[in-house]
Amino acid sequence: MLEHILSLGAYLFCIGIFGLITSRNMVRALMCLELIFNAVNINLITFSNSFDTQQAKGEIFAIFIIAIAAAEAAIGLAIVLAIYRNKNSTRIDQFNLLKW
C-alpha cells in the first residue's frame, strides 16, 4: 500500500513538473505548481503515517503547506490579473516587464 501511494505522489509530481516546464499560460503554470504542492503533501502524509503513527507531525506540515499554497495562489492570481489588465494576455512568453 505504501508503494502505491508514493508512486501516486511521484506521478503527480512528474505531471506537475512537466506541465510547469511546457505551459505557456500563467494560470496553467500556477495550477501545475499547486499540483506539485499536493504531490508533496501526499508523500509527506504517507511517510508520517507509515513511520510515526503516534504523532501528527506530517499532517501539521501538510496543513502548513496547504496554507502557504493558498497564499501563493492568491498572490499569483492577483499578479496574473494585473498582467492581463495591462497586456490583455496571460501567455508567459509575452511577459517581459522585468527585462531591461
Swiss-Prot record:
Lineage top rank: taxon: Eukaryota
Enzyme class: translocase
Transmembrane spans: 1-21, 29-49, 60-80
Coiled coil feature spans: none
One term of GO molecular function: quinone binding
Example GO BP: ATP synthesis coupled electron transport
Family matches, as InterPro entries: NADH_UbQ_OxRdtase_chain4L/K, NUOK/Mnh_C1-like
Keyword Amino-acid biosynthesis (UniProt): no
Subcellular location: Plastid, Chloroplast thylakoid membrane
The reaction(s) this protein catalyses: a plastoquinone + NADH + (n+1) H(+)(in) = a plastoquinol + NAD(+) + n H(+)(out); a plastoquinone + NADPH + (n+1) H(+)(in) = a plastoquinol + NADP(+) + n H(+)(out)
One Pfam short name: Oxidored_q2
GO cellular component: chloroplast thylakoid membrane; NADH dehydrogenase complex
HAMAP family: NDH1_NuoK (MF_01456)
Record protein name field: NAD(P)H-quinone oxidoreductase subunit 4L, chloroplastic
Record lineage: Eukaryota, Viridiplantae, Streptophyta, Embryophyta, Bryophyta
Gene from which the chain derives: ndhE
